[in-house]
């Protein structure tokens, strides 16, 4: 009788695990479905959302961390452009806030480099977040256009879209 009880418990745990997995997949699919169509600008895909920069940035950081990823570097682009404006002769401030967050997935990068060791240049991945001085009510999130000639890059691009979808649904 103990054997049947143990098997029943194992099935119960398996059932809960499968249910949780199904819910997670459904959540990921619904997030992807909520992702608006990006505006394609040059080599970038740009998503725009109303809100405050710091709130959307916090949501972006959380979405990256929720994927189990660690931000390895933050490029403070607006600060750099402001700091170097005199030296470069810049007369117009384009961004109120602008950063690029860099991170990588060991699993995806391993797959990319296994198929082609030169794909290491595709890591780290980045998502830029910024507000334009001409449009302070909206926050922009942008990623590089997908590397269409790199079939292996599709998983990376899907990850970036998942992160943006999660950011926009907070």
Regions found by a protein language model. Give the residues of each.
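C-terminal partner/receptor-binding element of secreted or periplasmic proteins
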Residues: 140-170
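Solvent-exposed, acidic/flexible segments
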Residues: 49-57, 74, 91-94, 149-153, ...
């Amino acid at each position: 009788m103990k054997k049947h009880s143990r098997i029943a418990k194992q099935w119960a745990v398996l059932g809960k695990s499968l249910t949780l997995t199904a819910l997670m997949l459904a959540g990921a699919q619904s997030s992807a479905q909520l992702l608006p169509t990006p505006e394609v600008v040059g080599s970038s895909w740009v998503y725009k959302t109303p809100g405050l920069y710091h709130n959307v940035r916090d949501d972006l950081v959380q979405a990256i961390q929720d994927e189990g990823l660690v931000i390895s570097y933050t490029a403070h682009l607006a600060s750099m452009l402001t700091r170097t404006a005199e030296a470069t002769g810049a007369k117009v401030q384009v961004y109120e806030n602008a950063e690029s967050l860099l991170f990588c997935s060991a699993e995806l990068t391993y797959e990319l480099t296994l198929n082609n060791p030169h794909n290491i240049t595709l890591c780290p991945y980045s998502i830029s977040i910024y507000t334009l001085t001409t449009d302070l009510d909206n926050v922009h999130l942008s990623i590089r256009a997908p590397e269409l000639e790199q079939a292996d890059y599709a998983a990376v691009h899907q990850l970036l879209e998942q992160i943006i979808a999660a950011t926009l649904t907070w």
